[in-house]
Amino acid sequence: MKQLLEFIPLILFFTVYKLYGVQQAAITLVIATVIQLIVLKVLYKKIEKSQWIMGIFVVFFGILTAYFNDLNFLKWKVTIINGLFAAVLLVSQFVFKKPIIQMLLGKELKLPTNVWNRLNLGWAGFFIICMLLNIVISYYFSDDVWATFKTFGFTGLSLIAAIATGVYLYPHLKNVENTNEQA
């Protein structure tokens, strides 16, 4: 349910963009994102930091996009967000010496340090790839291609990255379960 709720503003943006253009799509995205945050707060009693960050960026860049009737502002948002997420992951690992993914999920998952490090680097790499893809598609393809790729391409890539994470973690989770059963 939560993942579907997070996907709704994007689908609304894409639909309105195709039917009515950039300005109306940006306004729809901003309104849908604010409603989404309210619904998340009501249903789950909590809004994650990443959701707040995304919400603030969407509202800020969405308003700029609507005001100037220029899709480039939302294109920049995608690049900045992916770069920011990659930077946070890399700084957590190389400056603070503890992967942020471990800080977020360490209570639920007990994994060796090297697995956390690889997982953190894998997701940092994913965000860097998304950032670079967004730059290329933004500058070398039409706005329609960008909007379609933003809606469906990045969603597909995120799904693939999540599945790859599960496949990578599966053997390590079995090892942790076996260790717990022996104890």
From Swiss-Prot:
Keywords: Cell inner membrane, Cell membrane, Membrane, Transmembrane, Transmembrane helix. Disulfide bonds: none annotated. Pfam families: IspA (PF04279). It is found in: Cell inner membrane. The keyword Cell wall biogenesis/degradation does not apply. The chain crosses the membrane at residues 19-39, 53-73, 76-96, 121-141, 151-171. InterPro entries: YciB (IPR006008). It is a multi-pass membrane protein. Its main location: membrane. One of its GO terms (cellular component) is plasma membrane. The keyword Disulfide bond does not apply. Belongs to the YciB family. PANTHER family: INNER MEMBRANE-SPANNING PROTEIN YCIB (PTHR36917:SF1), INTRACELLULAR SEPTATION PROTEIN A-RELATED (PTHR36917). Plays a role in cell envelope biogenesis, maintenance of cell envelope integrity and membrane homeostasis. HAMAP family: YciB. This is Inner membrane-spanning protein YciB. It comes from Actinobacillus pleuropneumoniae serotype 7 (strain AP76). The lineage of its organism: Bacteria, Pseudomonadati, Pseudomonadota, Gammaproteobacteria, Pasteurellales.
